[in-house]
Amino acid sequence: MKFVDEVSIFVKAGDGGNGMMSFRREKFIEKGGPNGGDGGDGGSVFLEADENLNTLIDYRYTRKFHAQNGEKGGSTDCTGAKGEDLILPVPVGTTVIDVATQEVIGDLVKPGQRLMVAQGGWHGLGNTRFKSSTNRAPRQTTPGKPGESRDLKLELKVLADVGLLGLPNAGKSTFIRAVSAAKPKVADYPFTTLVPNLGVVSVDRFKSFVVADIPGLIEGASEGAGLGIRFLKHLARTRLLLHLVDMAPLDESDPAEAAQVIIDELGRFSPALAERDRWLVLNKMDQIPEDEREARKADIVARLGWQGPVYVVSAISRDGTERICRDIMHYLEVRAERIAEDPVFAEELAELDQRIEDEARARLQALDDQRALRKSGVRSVDDIDEDDDFFDDEDDDGPEIIYVRD
């Protein structure tokens, strides 16, 4: 199944049913009076987080969704039936954005969580409602109100405790295969991983965490090189980042320089994400003579000015992987306890999470704007005159850019 993490859809809630105008007409009953019923409310549109879904592909081709209208009122004071609500299932971790205002309507982060994105129209009133002491036979009714309609952008960010960073062929997929039951494709060429992969790491019988592997970054990713930085958004909700470095690259490149590339690209994408706790994992150390390993480790730590934890592993032979998994589990438990006991720390983390979300969304929007400029033949914003209506929302002749990552 294709992995789709961004879609645009249109939702329309049901209109309210019109009120009914009718009068009681029975044999031997004169001037029976009004008996027109109210209409039914229109159905609303909800998004519901479904833990069995992991992609937005269902909304790639079907983009317009309408809830049921309310039925009109009936005679004998019968109220029209309410329109049926429309419930659209989405993967857990979906962010819902109003396209018109760029406002984040909500995040669906728990299975079964529901979010109303379009409210059904209010029912119309039947003529019975307007009966009074001075108006015994009202002929007034009201129509149902139209339901809300919205253009929405759905963004999926995978939910994981730990995220893996590194250049292509750094061994991220091999690492996730070594520590979990996930089986991502592994090969000796760049960009083997094209979509995020999730793996559940079981440390003890009742202790586990989720790790996410995203496609590798290369130098210039922030400008769109390689697979770009679009997949970095999937690390926004992680609690810890593991920076994997290939210590024995086939092209004999400098591991320290390769690690610095990732650090620089991460900072360009989101300075707040670069503040997330990060551990350095030196992979493929089994290919380095044992008497040289400590010196290699000390050299890269010194050149990077690294202050955080450093681990030496060999993912393919699983050397050192059990230790790092237990340390990760301990880190996550201590972090959760501190959040529960220290409100100041919890607030600081919440602010950091919000900054990461805001910066990631702004950066990705900037990339989409640049792509739109290039496709329109404009090289840069400086080439647009002040009187140019390129960004005029009322100009229907402008290009429409819809980005979907397969």
Curated annotation (Swiss-Prot):
<feature type="domain" description="OBG-type G">
    <location>
        <begin position="160"/>
        <end position="333"/>
    </location>
</feature>
<feature type="binding site">
    <location>
        <begin position="314"/>
        <end position="316"/>
    </location>
    <ligand>
        <name>GTP</name>
    </ligand>
</feature>
<dbReference type="InterPro" id="IPR006073">
    <property type="entry name" value="GTP-bd"/>
</dbReference>
<dbReference type="GO" id="GO:0000287">
    <property type="term" value="F:magnesium ion binding"/>
</dbReference>
<feature type="region of interest" description="Disordered">
    <location>
        <begin position="376"/>
        <end position="406"/>
    </location>
</feature>
<dbReference type="GO" id="GO:0042254">
    <property type="term" value="P:ribosome biogenesis"/>
</dbReference>
<dbReference type="GO" id="GO:0005525">
    <property type="term" value="F:GTP binding"/>
</dbReference>
<dbReference type="GO" id="GO:0005737">
    <property type="term" value="C:cytoplasm"/>
</dbReference>
<comment type="subunit">
    <text>Monomer.</text>
</comment>
<comment type="similarity">
    <text>Belongs to the TRAFAC class OBG-HflX-like GTPase superfamily. OBG GTPase family.</text>
</comment>
<feature type="binding site">
    <location>
        <begin position="166"/>
        <end position="173"/>
    </location>
    <ligand>
        <name>GTP</name>
    </ligand>
</feature>
<dbReference type="InterPro" id="IPR006074">
    <property type="entry name" value="GTP1-OBG_CS"/>
</dbReference>
<feature type="binding site">
    <location>
        <position position="173"/>
    </location>
    <ligand>
        <name>Mg(2+)</name>
    </ligand>
</feature>
<keyword id="KW-0378">Hydrolase</keyword>
<dbReference type="GO" id="GO:0003924">
    <property type="term" value="F:GTPase activity"/>
</dbReference>
<dbReference type="Pfam" id="PF01018">
    <property type="entry name" value="GTP1_OBG"/>
</dbReference>
<dbReference type="InterPro" id="IPR027417">
    <property type="entry name" value="P-loop_NTPase"/>
</dbReference>
<dbReference type="InterPro" id="IPR006169">
    <property type="entry name" value="GTP1_OBG_dom"/>
</dbReference>
<feature type="binding site">
    <location>
        <position position="193"/>
    </location>
    <ligand>
        <name>Mg(2+)</name>
    </ligand>
</feature>
<feature type="binding site">
    <location>
        <begin position="213"/>
        <end position="216"/>
    </location>
    <ligand>
        <name>GTP</name>
    </ligand>
</feature>
<dbReference type="InterPro" id="IPR014100">
    <property type="entry name" value="GTP-bd_Obg/CgtA"/>
</dbReference>
<keyword id="KW-0479">Metal-binding</keyword>
<dbReference type="Pfam" id="PF01926">
    <property type="entry name" value="MMR_HSR1"/>
</dbReference>
<keyword id="KW-0963">Cytoplasm</keyword>
<keyword id="KW-0342">GTP-binding</keyword>
<keyword id="KW-0547">Nucleotide-binding</keyword>
<dbReference type="InterPro" id="IPR036726">
    <property type="entry name" value="GTP1_OBG_dom_sf"/>
</dbReference>
<keyword id="KW-0460">Magnesium</keyword>
<feature type="binding site">
    <location>
        <begin position="191"/>
        <end position="195"/>
    </location>
    <ligand>
        <name>GTP</name>
    </ligand>
</feature>
<dbReference type="InterPro" id="IPR031167">
    <property type="entry name" value="G_OBG"/>
</dbReference>
<feature type="domain" description="Obg">
    <location>
        <begin position="1"/>
        <end position="159"/>
    </location>
</feature>
<feature type="compositionally biased region" description="Polar residues">
    <location>
        <begin position="129"/>
        <end position="143"/>
    </location>
</feature>
<feature type="region of interest" description="Disordered">
    <location>
        <begin position="126"/>
        <end position="149"/>
    </location>
</feature>
<dbReference type="InterPro" id="IPR045086">
    <property type="entry name" value="OBG_GTPase"/>
</dbReference>
<feature type="compositionally biased region" description="Acidic residues">
    <location>
        <begin position="383"/>
        <end position="399"/>
    </location>
</feature>
<protein>
    <recommendedName>
        <fullName>GTPase Obg</fullName>
        <ecNumber>3.6.5.-</ecNumber>
    </recommendedName>
</protein>
<feature type="binding site">
    <location>
        <begin position="283"/>
        <end position="286"/>
    </location>
    <ligand>
        <name>GTP</name>
    </ligand>
</feature>
<comment type="function">
    <text>An essential GTPase which binds GTP, GDP and possibly (p)ppGpp with moderate affinity, with high nucleotide exchange rates and a fairly low GTP hydrolysis rate. Plays a role in control of the cell cycle, stress response, ribosome biogenesis and in those bacteria that undergo differentiation, in morphogenesis control.</text>
</comment>
